A protein has these predicted regions:
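Transmembrane beta-strand segments that form the barrel wall of outer-membrane beta-barrel proteins
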Residues: 1, 238-247, 289
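Short, contiguous hydrophobic alpha-helices characteristic of membrane insertion segments
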Residues: 224-242
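Short glycine/threonine-rich loop-to-helix capping motif typified by GTGT followed
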Residues: 252-257
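Residues on the lipid-exposed face of transmembrane beta-strands in outer-membrane beta-barrel proteins
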Residues: 13-17, 96-102, 157-161, 174, ...
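P-loop NTPase catalytic cores that bind/hydrolyze ATP
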Residues: 108-110, 114, 434-436, 530, ...
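Surface-exposed loop/interface segments of Gram-negative outer-membrane beta-barrel transport/assembly proteins
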Residues: 2, 10, 14-93, 113-222, ...
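Glycine-rich, aromatic-lined ligand/substrate-binding cores of catalytic
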Residues: 521-556
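Active-site and NAD+-binding cores of ADP-ribose-processing enzymes
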Residues: 618
Length: 625
């Protein structure tokens, strides 16, 4: 996109030093990045598509062209890019780790690592006076200077011991890890500059309104963990893992949680009764069960948060819900004292979200490992889902509150099959295909959350029993082709010849909210892939194909390509599909007739926008010599 750019500089340093033979080793791995970018303004592509081609880029006097009376309120996209070209950010990041490794005797190892990830971002965003036809900011000039800082550090200490006695082989591991993250940001804003250049436009040079913002937060995580692996004759395999994590995002009552896991394996081909099957190289049964935790919520989720909200007014109803109060009786004169508004209700009892997963699988290879593959079934259940619930009205202001409530399950199969060999004329090949299924279901949620649309259902129906993010909508049942069809249909506000007909599901003679049904499922019936590797003499070719079958997508593009009334703004550029819109001379079209107003509410969620998202694409192709 014109007047945007992106530059990145990277430097890397790695080193390892053996101080005492193989007993003591130290090392470090660090990377330094510098990124500088001018990003495209938000929505610039949409603006360029929307603005009518009849509006020139430049007016006859050389100034920027723009809409005039009666034309839509869209800015000149070329002017937007010009005024955006100085809005640059610079981002520095240094990350890496240093370690000490101690091997006191055979099989025993202790390693301690300290990791650091520090980032700093500086940016300035300029507002220049502009006049583009009727679009103007009335000579306003301003700048916002922003600083953002992120600091993450990690320290761990891990001890391992390996031992092998005859057919018995095993290893144990124990360790702990500390993590800390701190983020802060602040910005200064100033208006009215006498010189409109980036070198001059710093907040101190402005003479108008000044504002400052800033905040900071962080969290800590401590983990203790251990693992034991054991195998007998490489035939029977056992692995046990236990970890305990504590996060500052949770209250003292539930800050820590324990997550165990176990896995078992049986390599059947190592049994004596399988020795005669020489064509079977490897056959392994495996099963595992384990738990993991999730703490990805706001750092302030457990706190009750109060904030001043001075002089805020509802832009629609005009009702003031600000926190200013005339304590002194000045009848509104001057600046009033401000109280505080509760923005979040605290909950010191929120705890870790837990996922319990069970896997059962089989791995195999045959004919000197030419034919190989695996089959696996998994079942995953997530409980104590962390979610925000709207505050109860009797508690007063407060909005949302973080809670643990709800459960969700995921299950599916994964199958992988490959074949590799070499032909008589020297072509080496390896073909590997995979297919997987995945089903998801919301098992339980609080009633207010299940029906508010956050997990799916569009706020119309409870999503419990359905797929996460599945949607409810109307069933588009073709186009009204005659007045007789309109008259014989259920009462539908806005119904007319050439308009979309919606199905009366409950047969009550009225198209209303009760006629919505589950119409969108974002999970595919199955997904698949194919890896191809070919090698001949000094040439090699690699390809990766990926496909998804039986998945729904919602095409929001249709709201612009199929409706003249999109965004309720006339005179915007439209999609060429409208050239095939319904008309008396084009009665078989599936695109509704042209109209300047959406009286039939055809932009409502409906099957008209739901399409089959199945695809097969070539993800990667590489030829080497």
């Amino acid at each position: 996109i014109k007047d945007t750019d992106f530059d990145r500089f990277s430097a890397r340093m790695n080193s390892d030093y053996k101080l005492i033979d193989d007993i003591l080793t130290i090392g470090q791995h660090f990377t330094l990045n510098r990124t500088s970018e001018v990003q495209a303004p938000g929505g610039i592509i949409e603006t360029a598509l929307d603005i009518p081609s009849a509006i020139p880029v430049y007016a006859s006097d050389g100034s920027w062209g723009g809409p005039v009376g009666g034309w839509p309120d869209r800015r000149n996209p070329r002017a937007v890019l010009e005024y955006n070209k100085d809005n640059r950010y610079t981002y520095w990041r240094m990350f890496g780790d240093a370690y000490v490794n101690l091997s006191l005797f055979k099989g025993f190892n202790v390693r301690s690592t300290f990791g650091l990830d520090y980032a700093n971002k500086q940016a300035r965003y300029f507002t220049y006076p502009y006049q583009e036809g009727t679009q103007t900011n009335n000579g306003k000039s301003a700048v916002e200077a922003k600083q953002e800082h992120w600091t993450k550090w990690m320290w761990n200490a891990i001890a391992t011991y390996q031992l092998e006695i005859g057919k018995h082989r095993g290893d144990v591991m124990a360790g702990m890890e500390l993590n800390r993250e701190d983020d802060s940001h602040f910005s200064g804003y100033k208006e009215d500059f006498s010189i409109l250049t980036p070198d001059y436009m710093w907040p101190d040079a402005g003479s108008g309104t000044a504002q400052a913002y800033g905040a900071g937060e962080g969290y800590s995580l401590v983990s203790f963990f251990g693992k034991m692996n054991y195998s007998y004759a490489d035939r029977y395999l056992l692995s046990l893992t236990l970890r305990r994590d504590g996060s500052s995002r949770f209250g003292k009552n539930h800050r820590y949680a324990t997550f165990p896991s176990v896995s078992l394996g049986w390599r059947i081909t190592q049994e004596s009764f399988m020795k005669e099957l020489t064509w079977l190289d490897d056959l392994k049964l495996r099963a595992s069960w384990g738990q993991t935790g999730n703490q990805e919520i706001s750092n302030l989720a457990r706190y009750t948060i109060y904030a001043p909200n001075y002089g805020t007014t509802d832009s629609f109803g005009g009702q003031s819900y600000g926190t200013a109060y005339d304590i002194t009786g000045s009848n509104g004169g001057g600046t009033l004292p401000s109280g505080f508004k509760r923005n979040q209700i605290g909950n010191d009892n929120i705890k870790w979200e837990t996922t319990t997963q069970t896997n059962v699988g089989i791995d195999f290879s045959l004919f000197k490992q030419s034919l190989y593959g695996s089959l696996e079934y998994y079942y995953k259940k997530t409980t104590d889902i962390l979610t925000e619930m709207a505050g109860v009205g009797v508690l007063g202001e407060g909005g949302n509150r973080w809670i643990n409530s709800g459960a969700m399950k995921n299950q599916g199969f994964e199958f992988n099959l490959g074949y590799r060999n070499k032909t008589a004329f020297g072509l080496t090949y390896d073909l590997n295909g995979n297919i997987s299924t995945y089903r998801n279901e919301i098992l339980e949620l609080p009633e207010t959350v299940a029906a508010n649309g956050k997990f799916g259902g569009n706020g119309v129906k409870s999503v419990v029993g359905h797929t996460y993010n599945s949607q409810v909508g109307y069933i588009a049942d073709g186009i009204f082709k005659s007045q007789e069809e309109v008259d014989n249909h259920a009462t539908q506000e806005g119904a007319a010849v050439g308009r979309i007909r919606y199905r009366d599901i409950d047969h009550n003679g009225v198209i209303d909210e009760k006629d919505q049904e589950w119409i969108y499922d974002p999970t595919p019936a199955f997904s698949y892939g194919l890896n191809i590797y070919l090698e001949y003499k000094n040439f090699d070719l690699t390809m990766f194909w990926q496909g998804v079958q039986g998945v729904d997508i919602i095409s929001d593009v249709k709201k612009k390509s199929d409706f003249w009334s999109a965004s309720n703004v006339g005179f915007l550029n439209k999609g060429t599909r409208l050239l095939n819109a319904w008309s008396p001379t084009n009665p078989n079209s599936t695109i509704p007739a042209l109209t300047r107003s959406d009286t039939n509410n055809e932009q409502r969620v409906s099957t008209y926008f739901v399409e089959n998202g199945s695809f097969l694409k070539l993800r990667t192709i590489q030829l080497g010599y």
